[in-house]
Amino acid sequence: MAVTVVNHPLVKHKLGILRQHDVPVSEFRAISNEICRLLTYEATKDLETEKVTIQGWAGPVEVDQIRGKKITVVPILRAGLGMLDGLLDMIPGAKVSVVGMFRNEETLEPVKYYVKLAKNIEERMAIIIDPMLATGGTLNATIDLLKEAGCPQIKGLFLVAAPEGIKKVVDRHPDVDIYVAAVDERLNEHGYILPGLGDAGDKIFGTK
């Protein structure tokens, strides 16, 4: 597994805005998608391209096109939906799979309540999106079900992550690459990231 922190001035600046306790809902949504676009750029650098000839304005011209890689984006409900538009802006042809999970606040273990995967998942690279990688339990459970369905390659994009969660995922799924805007200090006793973003789902959907 490779853990890539996208250490770019634009990412740092935008993430700093998201950390403000009183950031408006509309701004939180917009910036979450902006950061997701930048993470997507990094996560897709290894896509292979091929030369094809198209008809340009002045005649035939040779261009590069992504070669046959089928992609599905997997938002983890509900907060992951807040990054979906950003990724689809970059890869509009990606199919959308949906995984619904919530964390039991007493045990901190993930509870699955909904799964709808794209067809031919065994032929697709899956890109999981979720604002926060905290304990790692939800991500591990999502990776488990994607692998059980036959998905051959999996990546994850996150706004912030905790070291504890990264380690948990690395130990269980060393073949999955993670891209994150920042690795924060730690988890608190309730399993929340510090300094973190607060409840990203509430901030995205205006239910805080």
Swiss-Prot record:
Q: Which UniProt keywords apply?
A: Allosteric enzyme, Glycosyltransferase, GTP-binding, Magnesium, Nucleotide-binding, Transferase
Q: Which GO terms describe its molecular function?
A: GTP binding; magnesium ion binding; uracil phosphoribosyltransferase activity
Cofactor(s) recorded for this entry are: Mg(2+)
Which Gene3D superfamilies does the record cross-reference, listed alphabetically?
Answer: 3.40.50.2020
This molecule's function is given as: Catalyzes the conversion of uracil and 5-phospho-alpha-D-ribose 1-diphosphate (PRPP) to UMP and diphosphate.
By sequence similarity, the record places it as follows: Belongs to the UPRTase family.
Q: What is this protein called?
A: Uracil phosphoribosyltransferase
Taxonomic classification: Bacteria, Pseudomonadati, Thermodesulfobacteriota, Desulfovibrionia, Desulfovibrionales
Q: Which residues take part in binding 5-phospho-alpha-D-ribose 1-diphosphate?
A: 78, 103, 130-138, 199
* HAMAP family assigned to the protein according to its UniProt record, in alphabetical order: Upp_B (MF_01218_B)
Matching InterPro entries: PRibTrfase_dom, PRTase-like, Upp_B, UPRTase/APRTase, Ura_phspho_trans
